[in-house]
Amino acid sequence: MSMRIMVVEDDALIALDIVGLLEDLGHEVVAEAADAFTAWELAEGDTPDLALVDIRLARNTDGGKLAQQLYDRLGVRSLFVSGSITDDFREAMAAINPVGFIGKPVTRRSLGDALAACA
């Protein structure tokens, strides 16, 4: 199942890699943002099926708070991608029913498996 996905990642090279992987897997990347403020504005304008979100974002914004807002206000679930996912973070995010958590570096297999689980 092809999904419309928003990528929220502050590292441009990692974002580029993730976008390429998503497109290779047959998904449409409908928006890209490096910070939570921009991501929220983009999601309000064109709500994605899923948000792929880093935990620490540009402009000192918080990916966890963004994911909570996306879920509470727009019903958009998130797939977290980060090099610093802790058990405490997983527990804090449990209420928003995330698709999953992927560590960096992201591979085609880890991303494909996580996305297949939410189809």
Predicted features and spans:
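Acidic, metal-coordinating helix/loop segments flanking the phosphotransfer/catalytic sites
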Residues: 19, 32-50
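Short amphipathic alpha-helix used as the core "switch/output" element in two-component signaling
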Residues: 64-76
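C-terminal output helix
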Residues: 88, 106-118
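Active-site residues of response regulator receiver
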Residues: 54-55
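Two-component/phosphorelay signaling modules centered on CheY-like receiver
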Residues: 12-31
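Conserved acidic carboxylate
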Residues: 9
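As written
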Residues: 92-102
